[in-house]
Curated annotation (Swiss-Prot):
Component of the spliceosome C complex required for the selective processing of microRNAs during embryonic stem cell differentiation. Required for the biogenesis of all miRNAs from the pri-miR-17-92 primary transcript except miR-92a. Only required for the biogenesis of miR-290 and miR-96 from the pri-miR-290-295 and pri-miR-96-183 primary transcripts, respectively. Required during the transition of embryonic stem cells (ESCs) from the naive to primed state. Gene3D superfamilies: Helix hairpin bin. Identified in the spliceosome C complex. Component of the XAB2 complex, a multimeric protein complex composed of XAB2, PRPF19, AQR, ZNF830, ISY1, and PPIE. Identified in a pentameric intron-binding (IB) complex composed of AQR, XAB2, ISY1, ZNF830 and PPIE that is incorporated into the spliceosome as a preassembled complex. The IB complex does not contain PRPF19. Interacts with CPSF3; this interaction is in an RNA independent manner. Interacts with the microprocessor complex subunits DGCR8 and DROSHA; this interaction is in an RNA dependent manner. The gene is ISY1. It comes from the Eukaryota. This is Pre-mRNA-splicing factor ISY1 homolog. It is found in: Nucleus. It comes from Homo sapiens.
């Protein structure tokens, strides 16, 4: 096939083709597909476009053409593909077959379509151009997301801050901050002391007297304390050492007697109650 294509491109072959076409009026393909009103001509122009696409696809396979020539050929092929689609729509409008459904799929043979790039395709050596190869590389899968249990397994003392002092950085900083804070407190105490001295000796004497008499006890307080001690002694004298506690049997007998009295008061007459009381008294109960 390559040998036949080379023969067709020789000067003799082109001269012979020009001789055969002399005297014929070469019909030019309409710029717009909508200008064609005949179905056979629309089919003819579609076949012509497919032939041009095939020639350019064969040329673009040669990687030695150079980057700019390969890009131009790829643009021309995409332009012809769009034009072919217009003629297929026009053929369908004129009552012809729907090549969009019944036509062969050309993506696998003619080029790869970049997703989201409005149908622009790359053919032959154009797939290996700088910046194009990366478009067809698959993105690496994101790392699997760890569950909460897996994250908790990796938690140690360092997570809670127990090892912060081992880095040798935080301890010197804390010591420096502590020195600074102590110096500030000392300066504050000195300023307060100087302010107290500036107020006068009288206030100092009053403060000293208050400090001296802070543990002084008045007569009223001493009397109250004495009365409390006496009261404590009286309470100790009145304390009863032993209180007899009734046994379980004595409690049951008392309950039985109480129940009997309630029944007698409820059902017996006054005369019968008086007789029973007298009998109990005589018997010694």
């Amino acid at each position: 096939m390559a040998r036949n294509a080379e023969k067709a491109m020789t000067a003799l072959a082109r001269f012979r083709q020009a001789q055969l076409e002399e005297g014929k009026v070469k019909e030019r393909r309409p710029f717009l597909a909508s200008e064609c009103t005949e179905l056979p001509k629309a089919e003819k122009w579609r076949r012509q476009i497919i032939g041009e696409i095939s020639k350019k696809v064969a040329q673009i396979q040669n990687a030695g053409l150079g980057e700019f020539r390969i890009r131009d050929l790829n643009d021309e092929i995409n332009k012809l593909l769009r034009e072919k689609g217009h003629w297929e729509v026009r053929i369908k409008e004129l009552g012809g077959p729907d090549y969009g459904k019944v036509g062969p799929k050309m993506l696998d043979h003619e080029g790869k379509e970049v997703p989201g790039n409005r149908g622009y395709k790359y053919f032959g050596a154009a797939k290996d151009l700088p910046g194009v190869r990366e478009l067809f590389e698959k993105e690496p899968l994101p790392p699997p997301r760890k569950t909460r249990a897996e994250l908790m397994k990796a938690i140690d003392f360092e997570y809670y801050g127990y090892l912060d002092e081992d880095d040798g950085v935080i301890v010197p900083l804390e010591q420096e901050y502590e020195k600074k804070l102590r110096a500030e407190l000392v300066e504050k105490w000195k300023a307060e002391r100087e302010a107290r001295l500036a107020r006068g000796e009288k206030e100092e004497e009053e403060e000293e007297e208050e400090e001296i008499n802070i543990y002084a006890v008045t007569e009223e307080e001493s009397d109250e304390e004495g009365s409390q001690e006496k009261g404590g002694d009286d309470s100790q004298q009145k304390f009863i050492a032993h209180v007899p506690v009734p046994s379980q049997q004595e409690i049951e007998e008392a309950l039985v007697r109480r129940k009997k009295m309630e029944l007698l008061q409820k059902y017996a007459s006054e005369t019968l109650q008086a007789q029973s009381e007298e009998a109990r008294r005589l018997l010694g109960y």
